[in-house]
């Protein structure tokens, strides 16, 4: 993985998506579900699809992961209450940064 900003904090990000997209020329899409009110007393969901920015498939992994994180962040910012904030993106810190794991309890 490579570190790239996610909500202003360096986050270790997978490079597999960018490598596969770069090698295959495949179209990359983002897909996510949004919880919606059905007015019928049970939850409903709306499925959203969006094309990823071209930079997600850049052969330079640093460019690809920065584009990936920026796009995911933009989706999360649409409705922050719908994002899975329990996913611990910042557990591993950049080497030599002096930053500590923000999830450790002291």
Briefly describe each language-model feature range.
Residues 1-106:
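Non-catalytic C-terminal accessory region of glycerolipid acyltransferases
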């Amino acid at each position: 993985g490579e570190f790239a900003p996610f909500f202003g904090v360096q986050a270790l990000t997978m490079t597999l998506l960018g490598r596969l997209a770069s090698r295959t020329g495949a179209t990359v899409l983002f897909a996510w579900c949004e919880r919606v009110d059905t007015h019928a007393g049970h939850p409903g969901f709306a499925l959203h699809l969006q094309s990823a920015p071209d930079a997600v498939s850049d052969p330079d992994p640093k460019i690809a992961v920065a584009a990936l994180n920026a796009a995911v962040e933009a989706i999360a910012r649409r409705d922050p209450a719908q994002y899975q904030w329990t996913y611990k993106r910042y557990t591993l810190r950049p080497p030599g940064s002096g930053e500590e794991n923000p999830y450790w309890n002291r």
